[in-house]
């Protein structure tokens, strides 16, 4: 499963410095972090709305689509900041032996 994320991370990294006129990812980077964060926020809202719709209708196609957009733009954000999916997956893996309450208590204030 993480192979897809790793391949996507490689593509995002390669397109970071591409021509903004020919690459959506490059155009986001050219506009700066605030534009990338704006897109993450927009996709987050769309994902939340799709989840509400899915709960009422039972149809999940839009939820999956919007979640993919959210993940994509989150990966662009991570790339901008020198991080990638491995950093997030490593963090998730480190939480496997903790209960949710233990993990929350271990966070720095």
Curated annotation (Swiss-Prot):
Keyword terms, alphabetized: Amino-acid biosynthesis, ATP-binding, Cytoplasm, Histidine biosynthesis, Hydrolase, Nucleotide-binding
Places the protein is found: Cytoplasm
Enzyme class, broadest EC rank: hydrolase
Pathway per the UniProt entry: Amino-acid biosynthesis; L-histidine biosynthesis; L-histidine from 5-phospho-alpha-D-ribose 1-diphosphate: step 2/9
Top-rank lineage group of the source organism: Bacteria
Record's keyword annotation contains Amino-acid biosynthesis: yes
Pfam family, one: PRA-PH
InterPro entries found in the cross-reference section: HisE, PRib-ATP_PPHydrolase-like
Cellular-component GO terms for this entry: cytoplasm
Enzymatic reactions: 1-(5-phospho-beta-D-ribosyl)-ATP + H2O = 1-(5-phospho-beta-D-ribosyl)-5'-AMP + diphosphate + H(+)
Enzyme Commission number(s): 3.6.1.31
GO molecular function, one term: phosphoribosyl-ATP diphosphatase activity
GO BP, sorted A to Z: L-histidine biosynthetic process
Family membership noted in the UniProt record: Belongs to the PRA-PH family.
Entries under NCBIfam families matching the protein: histidine_hisI, PRK00400.1-3
Protein name from the UniProt record: Phosphoribosyl-ATP pyrophosphatase
